[in-house]
Amino acid sequence: MDDGDILTLGNTSIRFVHTPGHTKGTISFFYDVKENEKTYRVGMFGGAGVNTMFKTAFDFDGCREAYLASVELLKKEKVDVFIGNHTWNNDTYGKSLKLLNGENNAFIDDKIWGAFLEHCEKRLADVIAEDP
């Protein structure tokens, strides 16, 4: 998939965004879902990890700058449902338990996306401070 490509599966159209940094080819994606007659935007940052930002692990020169540019690009996306690369990114397990207990859909949270992206920026700043 390339930046801006859209893949349609049934009634769902997934938009892909090239977000290099973690690796050169990192892709993030966005699509809409409906629940109770309401439409929500789902988003996933395909390369949130900063482990490749240490100089000994650089995937490519300029990866730190590319990562920050990707985070800035992703901040412009409106996301109601954030899907993490790993379950700890968005407390998948805890939110699933809430659903099983009949609570409101904890996955719908339009604030977690921005908070997670800010967390990604801080993690990179920590890496740069440790490994300038």
What are these regions (language model features)?
Residues 6-8, 13-99, 105-107, 111, ...:
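Metallo-beta-lactamase
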Residues 104-132:
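C-terminal regulatory/interaction regions
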